[in-house]
């Protein structure tokens, strides 16, 4: 759990054997199979909130709801969107009663937001919302657990912040290759191996045709 802010942060990613989350053209559906995707819905059901960056919304248009889980509850849906670029027709705005939070920066574009009773806009005091600020705001709203689902830049931001407690990595039996294909984690500023993030692997299990690595950050 994030020591200062009281929120347990879990980072979940689905990647190929060579660590890619999309091809060079941006195609990403599906890297993993149905069993792994069902596990993702179980994870969402166990967390108070789920978070993605704006690039993931624009590329994949996710719903971020819980489906296929008996008596499941969809978490609060959060988008990091520094410049308020999220399209108004994004599926995340579907009014199903699940709260939506958009975290923007202080230089965000002036715009009209969808008229939804469960929509909340948080404006950061900085151009790009800092992870510690985001977690502090979520804690004020009573949220105690957060599932981070992408993308590459957002994963890196959370890992660099030191707030991530748990990693849940679904590995699909595919190889994309190439330098242009998107790697699952963005720049961490690691120049020497002794600067690399160290993890403790709790378990490696088969999930359908895929593998699930459950680990903690040291």
Task: Please give the residue ranges for each predicted region.
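Enzymes that bind and transform nitrogen-containing heteroaromatic metabolites
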Residues: 1-218
